[in-house]
Amino acid sequence: MLEIHQFPCLSDNYGFLLHDPDSGETAAIDTPDGKEYLKQAKAKGWTITHIWNTHWHPDHAGGNKDIVEATGAKVIAPQEVEKLSGIDRVVGHGDTVDIGDFTADVIDVSGHTNGHIAYHLPEAGIAFVGDSVFALGCGRMFEGEPKQFWDSLSRIKALPPETMLYCAHEYTAANARFAVHADPENDALVAYVEEITAKRERDEPTVPTQLKRELATNPFLRADDPALVAKWGGDAPHETFAALRAGKDNF
């Protein structure tokens, strides 16, 4: 069985180490802070053998160099080679990546950046989604277009509903405030926000989050819902998504 070690990193990132006890392999999922990853791996008695980057932003790939120099880890990264260096294998939608006997499917989730990918391990029921989707939110649309981003979110929506989404940031409390503004009549959302508030008061993480719950509460995954279309407009889901994203940007 795969082991996941999650820890806070930088100001609001989460670090993830994915470990296969049988093979001894350990993957660093993104690298906000290489030294912190090495410290956490040492404390667990693990050696980082691979780095799986989701996109090029420094708070996701900035620690690659430190980890590679310390461990010789192999870097697996999306097709953003002009913005990343030292990549051992470039992967894109439809490719697979192995850790021990487990296989991760690479999914195109571009929109936040044009090469953003996620890693879905169906046998383990988990997905590492970077900044594509958050609990009650999604990433800013820095490089992509609304249709592109909505198509990416639709691929996430199509995963098994029990999938646990490992998002890269603790943004949930702020996302919750906009979600309630966007979808105030959603009873499931109101109940979820109460849980989130209690967790954050106890300084507990709200990540991972289950896809099933996000499908019922996350406005960015529900841009095809008639209630949100009526409130936010749009003749197609990606247009409603664009309105929601702009609303969040200015909230």
Swiss-Prot record:
What is the annotated role of this protein in its UniProt record?
Thiolesterase that catalyzes the hydrolysis of S-D-lactoyl-glutathione to form glutathione and D-lactic acid.
Q: Which CDD domains match?
A: hydroxyacylglutathione_hydrolase_MBL-fold
Q: This protein is called what? A: Hydroxyacylglutathione hydrolase
Residues noted as binding Zn(2+) 1 in the record, renumbered to the chain: H55, H57, H112, D131
Q: How does it assemble?
A: Monomer.
Q: How is the cofactor bound?
A: Binds 2 Zn(2+) ions per subunit.
Which gene name belongs to this protein?
A: gloB
Return the EC number.
3.1.2.6
